[in-house]
C-alpha cells in the first residue's frame, strides 16, 4: 500500500517536463488565443470529450454490475428449486417405505385375525354344542336346576353379545380394510401423478439449463467483445494523450527559452533606466508623437537599424520595455494556466491508471468466475445425468412395487370374499343358535309358569287348610266356653234348688249377693260385674279388647315398630293364662258363636271335620280368614310363616309422608278402636277406590251398627255380613288375589292382616322391558 503514495512525485515531474516540451514545440500559429473565461477552447473540448467517455464508461459499468447481480439471483433461485425438488423426492421415498411397512404389517395382522377367527368360531361351536347337550340333559331335572339354567342362559346371552361384538368388530375391520385399499389406490394414483410431474419438471429443468448455458456463452462472447472495444478505445485515448503530452512539452520548452530571453532583455533595460531618468523632461514634450514613434520604433526594430539619436532610442526602449512587461504578465498567466492544466492532466492520468488497474482486476475476477461457472455447469450436467438415471431406476422400482401391490390387492380381495363367506356361515349358525336359545327360553318360561301355578295351588290349599284349622280351633274354644258357662248355670240352678228346698223365702234375696257369697265359682274368673236384672249370667265374650281395624293391602307387608300404646305389641293373656290374640275381630271372618242364638245342630255341623287327606265339602266350608300380621315380628302367623317373600319394604317410602296424614290416621284408629265395632265398610271402600288411594279418616260412630244379643250383661255382635258363598277346593279365598300372568312384576304375597290403612303408593315398580323376575318360591 506504500507504492501508490511514493510513485506520483517522479511521475508528475516527467509529465510536467513532457508538457513543457509539447508547449515549446508548438508553432506560434497553433498557440491558442485567449477566451473570455481564461481557458483555451481545445482544452475545454478535450475535457468535455473525456467527461462524456467517463460517463459512458460509468453507465456501462453500472449496467454490467446490475446484470451480474441478476444472473447470480437467478442461479440462486434455480439452486433453491433443485434443493426443494430433491427434498420432495426424499419425502416421497420415505412415505413409500412407510406405506410398504404398513401394508406388510396389515398382511400379518389379517392372517393372524383369520386364524384367531377360525379358532374362536370352532371353540364357540363346541361351547354351543356343549351347552345344547347340557340343556337337553337338564330338561329332565328342571325342578331342581332352574337356577342353573338361568345362569347358563345368562352365560349364553353374554356369549351372544360377545359374538355380536365380534361380528361388529369384523365388519369394522372389513370396512377399515376397504378404506385402506381405497387409500392405497388413491396413493398409487397420486404417485403416478407425482412421477409424471417429476418427468415434466425434469424436462423443464433441462430446457432451463440449456437456456442458461446459451445465455452464459452469449454473455461471455459479449463480454469479450466489449472488453476488446474498451481496450481499443482506451488505446486511442492514451495515444492522443501522449501526443498532447509531447506538444505540451515542446510548448513548455519554447516558453522557457522565451522567458530566458526576456529576462536578459529586462536586465539590460533595468541597466539603461537610470540613464533614461535624466531624459524624462525631454520625453514629456514629445508625448504627442508617441504613435508615430512607436511605428518608427517597430520598423527600426524589425530592420535592425541603429538609432543615431539617443533620445529616440531611449524612448523606443522605454516603449519596448512597457510592452515586454505586458507580455511577461501574459506569459506568467499562461504559465500558471499551463501548470494547472498539467496538474489536471496528471490527475486524469492517475485516474486512468487506477481505472486500468481496476479493469484488469475485474477481468481477472470475471475470468475466475467464468471458470467457476463452467465447473459448476459441468457439475450440474453430471448431476442431471445422475438424477435422470436415479429417477428412471425409481420409476422401475415403483412400477414393480405397483405390480406387486396389485397382486396383493387381488389376493386380499379373494381373502375378503372368503372371510365374507365365513361370516355369512357364522351368521347363519348364530341365527340357528339364537332360535334354539329362544326355544329353550320359551320352554323354561313354560316350565316356570307350570311350577309357579303348582306352587300357588299348593299354597292356596295350605292356606285354606290353615284357615279351616283356625276356625276349628275357634269353634273348640267357643264350645269349651259354652260348656263352662252351662256348667256354671247348672251349679247356680242346683244351688237355687237347694236353697228353695231349705228355705222357700230365699227368693227375695238378690242374685248378686247370693252368688258372690255362696257360689263356688265366684268371684268370676273374668272379673265381670253380675247383672241384677238377669237371672242367668252370660259368659265372657270375645270383644273385651278394643277393636282395631285391619284392612288388607294387596302387596302385603306392614310397618316397622308400632306406637307404644298398640295392644298388639305382645300377646294378651287372660286370668286363665290362655292367649287372647284369637279374640281380635277380623272384618272378613265369621263372628264367634258363643253368644249366638244358633241351634245345636248348626254347632254340630261346625264341629264336623273332614277325615285327613280330604277337603271340606262345599256346604260345610268354613269362612276363610286372612293371615294375621304382628308389627313387632313382621312375620306371618300360621303355616305360611316359614316362607320368605321378596317384598320391597315401604317403610322408607312411608317416612316421607307428612305428619298430618299419620296423625289423622292414628286418630281414626283410636276412634275405631274405642267403638268395639268391626267396620266392614272400610274394606269395601278400599276395594272400590283401589290400592293406590289413601282413605280419609272416619268419623266416630256413636252407636252400634249391627244387631246385638241382649241376653247377657255385654252386647254380643251378630255377624256383620251374610256367610260367604261356598267355595271349591282351588277357589280363591276372600283375602286372596290371583297372581298376574308371567312375565311381569313379581307376584304379590298372600293377604295379611295389618293394623294400618292402605298406603297411597303402588306396591311394585314398573317392570323393565326384557327383565324376567326371579320366582318367589
From Swiss-Prot:
Return the Polar residues bias intervals.
530-541
Q: What is its main location?
A: membrane
Keyword Transport applies: no
Any idea where this protein resides?
Membrane
Keywords from UniProt, A to Z, are:
Coiled coil, Membrane, Transmembrane, Transmembrane helix
Q: How does it sit in the membrane?
A: Single-pass membrane protein
Q: Name one GO cellular component term.
A: endoplasmic reticulum exit site
Record has Aminoacyl-tRNA synthetase as a keyword: no
**UniProt tissue specificity:** Expressed in testis, placenta and skin. Expressed at lower level in mammary gland and stomach.
Q: GO annotations under biological process?
A: endoplasmic reticulum to Golgi vesicle-mediated transport; protein secretion; vesicle cargo loading
Coiled coil regions in record? 118-269, 339-494
Residue ranges, compositional bias (Basic and acidic residues): 572-591, 649-672
Membrane spanning stretches: 39-59
- Identify the stretch(es) annotated as Disordered: 510-688, 721-742
Query: Belongs to which family?
Result: Belongs to the cTAGE family.
Additional information: Tumor-associated antigen found in several cutaneous T-cell lymphoma (CTCL). Also found in colorectal and breast carcinomas, head and neck squamous cell carcinomas and melanoma.
Purpose of the protein: Tumor-associated antigen.
Question: What is the name of the protein in this document?
Answer: cTAGE family member 4
Organism placement in taxonomy? Eukaryota, Metazoa, Chordata, Craniata, Vertebrata
